[in-house]
C-alpha cells in the first residue's frame, strides 16, 4: 500500500448534538473553525476511499454507547418485532435502487421518498421510546406509517401506478433530506 496521510475517524451519534448535549452543535462549529486554521483537514469516508481505494478490511465488534455496551435498549422484548419489518423495507429499497432507472420525474421523486421513509423508520428513537415506555403508541405509529408508505411506494412503482398527488402529499409531510438520492442504496454506490 502506498503512503497514507494519518486519519482520525471520530463518529458520533447524531442524537447527541442538540438533544443530550445542547452545546454539541457549537462544539462542532468550533472544531471546523479550528480545522480551517490548522495544518490538518477534514475528509468524508467516501473521499478517503476514492483517495485510498485499497484497504485492509476489519470486522468491528458489535457495541453501543447504550446500557451495558450492547443493544439492550434497542433490541428488547418491547421493540424487537420491528427489525424484521425494517430488514424487509431495506431489501425493497436496495432492490429498486439496483433496478431500472426511473422513467420520469414522478418515479424519481417516489424512489427518493422511499429512501426518506426508510431512514425515518430506521431511526433508533422509536425503539428507545418503546423501551423507556414513553409515548409508545406514537413510536409504534411512526414506524408503521413509514414502513407502510415505503411498501406502497414500492408496489406502486413496480406496478407503474404511482399517484402524483399522494407522492406530493407524503413529500410535503415528511421532506427531511430534500437532496436525498435513492441511488445511495445501490450495492455498487462506491
Located regions from the model:
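Active-site and substrate-binding clefts of carbohydrate-active enzymes
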Residues: 1-190
Amino acid at each position: 500500500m502506498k503512503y497514507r496521510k494519518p486519519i482520525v475517524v471520530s463518529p458520533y451519534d447524531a442524537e447527541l448534538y442538540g438533544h443530550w448535549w445542547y452545546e454539541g452543535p457549537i462544539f462542532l462549529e468550533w472544531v471546523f473553525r479550528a480545522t480551517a486554521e490548522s495544518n490538518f483537514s477534514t475528509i468524508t469516508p467516501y473521499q478517503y476511499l476514492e483517495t485510498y481505494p485499497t484497504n485492509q478490511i476489519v470486522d468491528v465488534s458489535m457495541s453501543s454507547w447504550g446500557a451495558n455496551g450492547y443493544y439492550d435498549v434497542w433490541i428488547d422484548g418491547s421493540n424487537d418485532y420491528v427489525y424484521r419489518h425494517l430488514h424487509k423495507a431495506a431489501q425493497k429499497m436496495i432492490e429498486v435502487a439496483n433496478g431500472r432507472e426511473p422513467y420520469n420525474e414522478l418515479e424519481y421523486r417516489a424512489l427518493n421518498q422511499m429512501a426518506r421513509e426508510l431512514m425515518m423508520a430506521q431511526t433508533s428513537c422509536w425503539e428507545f421510546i418503546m423501551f423507556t415506555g414513553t409515548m409508545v403508541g406514537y413510536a409504534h405509529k411512526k414506524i408503521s406509517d413509514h414502513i407502510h408508505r415505503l411498501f406502497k411506494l414500492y408496489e406502486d412503482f413496480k406496478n407503474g401506478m404511482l399517484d402524483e398527488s399522494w407522492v406530493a402529499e407524503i413529500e410535503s409531510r415528511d421532506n427531511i433530506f430534500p437532496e436525498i438520492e435513492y441511488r445511495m442504496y445501490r450495492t455498487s454506490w462506491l
